[in-house]
């Protein structure tokens, strides 16, 4: 399909539907409420995964930091769902757009920094100057630490965008090679198709890992400010 300059501004669609519709409905289908005293295996597995994720991220936090538990589990569910839905044929992955990832990263990062200034302003400002810094280097180090602080949300967004985009490009290139070789050399087609299948499996893992990494880094930023 030919694309023009304004393709990135088009509304993302998944199987002909706006991407926002299945993304909003998908969590309610994945995590249904049980009407019985004993949950079935699917709900039990989902609750175990949620508790395991929260245990990995929230153990290091104090009481103030643990108030973000619902936000973080919602974030990892949203990113993982978006990444996985983007692997469906004829669909679009919103997390390949830097603008969307920045729209997620900047408010979350700003929230952690604002929490730090509200709870312990002195300690938050102290992070801008490492302990034991020589006096002549103090102005330069404050500038460097301030720049590194403001780079954090950009690094979050760029990391997610680059990893998801790179995987999709590889799948597109290998898929195109499979189609081309099917008309040139039939014996080579199964080999490349096997590689494409393995790459798709790897992309599923990358989609889940990147959701975890993004949420974990937000959790670490929160830990530094609470």
From Swiss-Prot:
GO MF, one annotated term: proton-transporting ATP synthase activity, rotational mechanism
Keyword tags: ATP synthesis, CF(0), Hydrogen ion transport, Ion transport, Membrane, Mitochondrion, Mitochondrion inner membrane, Transmembrane, Transmembrane helix, Transport
Chief location: mitochondrion
A biological-process GO annotation: proton transmembrane transport
Catalytic activity: H(+)(in) = H(+)(out)
Listed PROSITE patterns: ATPASE_A
Highest taxon in the source lineage: Eukaryota
Record-linked InterPro entries: ATP_synth_F0_asu, ATP_synth_F0_asu_AS, ATP_synth_F0_asu_bact/mt, F0_ATP_A_sf
Membrane protein topology class: Multi-pass membrane protein
Pfam families the UniProt entry points to: ATP-synt_A (PF00119)
Cellular-component GO terms for this entry: mitochondrial inner membrane; proton-transporting ATP synthase complex
Subcellular compartments: Mitochondrion inner membrane
Keyword Transmembrane helix applies: yes
Keyword Repeat: no
Membrane-crossing residue ranges in chain numbering: 12-32, 68-88, 97-117, 138-158, 164-184, 200-222
Family designation: Belongs to the ATPase A chain family.
Subunit details: Component of the ATP synthase complex composed at least of ATP5F1A/subunit alpha, ATP5F1B/subunit beta, ATP5MC1/subunit c (homooctomer), MT-ATP6/subunit a, MT-ATP8/subunit 8, ATP5ME/subunit e, ATP5MF/subunit f, ATP5MG/subunit g, ATP5MK/subunit k, ATP5MJ/subunit j, ATP5F1C/subunit gamma, ATP5F1D/subunit delta, ATP5F1E/subunit epsilon, ATP5PF/subunit F6, ATP5PB/subunit b, ATP5PD/subunit d, ATP5PO/subunit OSCP.
Function of the molecule: Subunit a, of the mitochondrial membrane ATP synthase complex (F(1)F(0) ATP synthase or Complex V) that produces ATP from ADP in the presence of a proton gradient across the membrane which is generated by electron transport complexes of the respiratory chain. ATP synthase complex consist of a soluble F(1) head domain - the catalytic core - and a membrane F(1) domain - the membrane proton channel. These two domains are linked by a central stalk rotating inside the F(1) region and a stationary peripheral stalk.
Protein name per the record: ATP synthase F(0) complex subunit a
The organism of origin for this protein: Hylobates lar (Lar gibbon)
Gene: MT-ATP6
